[in-house]
């Protein structure tokens, strides 16, 4: 891959899990970003322990040669919370803009079960036609707002949400304007669709409109247990559904090849939520960085 076009970041969720704060509560913010830099990454997404004042956060990152590339934002358009979502989005956007980020990764969280005890496959939510329309109109509006700051909005397809499957991604992308992008997540695509081929098909279909990439690997044996026992998303995370690239079932070489051939320009972010007491985050960050260097050449 071309290192002039693609930058490597890592998400703090491997150190401290915002959905389950007890996982990694002992890991400090400064330890987290220091280990990211030491592992060879130059970018990070934003976790709950990160200072939200750019005047505080930016110098701490710059000291380590790091920068912010994105931060999760939850939208609630399907639920009819348009005004609240847009108001909170504007504040979030201004923070990211001050940090120098160019993309805003969003997830439509109306009806989401990802943070609940519900079975991740059997109790997945679905949107009505009216809710789909609200989501599309809402994201089109967010894209216009982001453009005023020279930024772009992308939708993070995610397990346990109304935009998870290939069909749902297709419907979403067909309804929004061309200035609304997709955040492609290898792990969530594989987890949802169950195969390397289906995961790659999403990537290939939408590459011109993918502006942010999450690199997440999957352990097939844990997914099988999640299905057999009808476990929740968070139960799966604690058991090790996800891991870093090179440690699970996904072959990332075709992913990197597609991104390179299509001229992808932006960040690739290692995002692998595990229990840090079991999977040492620094050790796994080093493992991920080594694998990417070996397979992507950057």
UniProtKB/Swiss-Prot annotation:
Obligatory cofactor(s): glutathione; Co(2+); Mn(2+)
GO BP: inositol catabolic process
E.C. number(s) listed in UniProt: 4.2.1.44
Coiled coil start-end: none
InterPro entries for this protein: IolE, IolE/MocC, IolE/XylAMocC-like, Xyl_isomerase-like_sf, Xyl_isomerase-like_TIM-brl
UniProt GO MF annotations: manganese ion binding; myo-inosose-2 dehydratase activity
Reaction equation(s) it catalyzes: scyllo-inosose = 3D-3,5/4-trihydroxycyclohexane-1,2-dione + H2O
Keyword tags: Cobalt, Lyase, Manganese
Keyword Manganese assigned: yes
PANTHER family: HYDROXYPYRUVATE ISOMERASE, INOSOSE DEHYDRATASE
NCBIfam families from the UniProt entry: myo_inos_iolE
Membership in a protein family: Belongs to the IolE/MocC family.
Name the UniProt record assigns to this protein: Inosose dehydratase
Source organism (scientific name): Yersinia enterocolitica serotype O:8 / biotype 1B (strain NCTC 13174 / 8081)
Gene name in the database record: iolE
């Amino acid at each position: 891959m071309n290192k002039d076009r693609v930058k490597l970041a890592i998400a703090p969720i491997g150190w401290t899990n915002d959905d389950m704060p007890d996982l990694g509560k002992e890991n400090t913010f400064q330890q987290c970003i220091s280990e990211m830099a030491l592992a060879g990454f130059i970018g990070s997404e934003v976790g709950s322990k990160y200072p939200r004042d750019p005047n505080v956060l930016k110098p701490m990152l710059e000291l380590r040669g790091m920068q912010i590339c994105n931060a999760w934002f939850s939208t609630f358009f399907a639920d009819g919370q348009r005004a609240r979502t847009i108001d909170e989005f504007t504040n979030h956007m201004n923070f990211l803009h001050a940090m120098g980020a160019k993309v805003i990764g969003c997830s439509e969280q109306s009806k989401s079960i990802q943070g609940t005890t519900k079975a991740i496959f059997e109790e997945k939510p679905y949107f009505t036609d009216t809710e789909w329309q609200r989501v599309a109109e809402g994201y089109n509006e967010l894209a216009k707002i982001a453009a005023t700051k020279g930024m772009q909005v992308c939708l993070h397809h995610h397990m346990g949400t109304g935009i998870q499957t290939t069909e749902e991604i297709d419907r979403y992308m067909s309804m929004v304007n061309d200035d609304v992008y997709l955040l492609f997540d290898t792990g969530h695509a594989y987890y949802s669709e169950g195969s390397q081929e289906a995961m790659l098909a999403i990537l290939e279909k939408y590459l011109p409109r993918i502006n942010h990439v999450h690199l997440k690997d999957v352990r097939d044996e844990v997914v099988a247990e999640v299905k057999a026992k009808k476990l929740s998303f968070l139960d799966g995370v604690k058991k090790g559904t996800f891991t870093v690239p090179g440690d699970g079932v996904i072959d990332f070489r075709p992913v990197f090849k597609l991104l390179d051939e299509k001229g992808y320009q932006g960040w690739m972010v290692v995002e692998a939520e595990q229990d840090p007491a079991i999977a040492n985050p620094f050790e796994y960050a080093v493992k991920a960085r080594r694998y990417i260097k070996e397979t992507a050449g950057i």
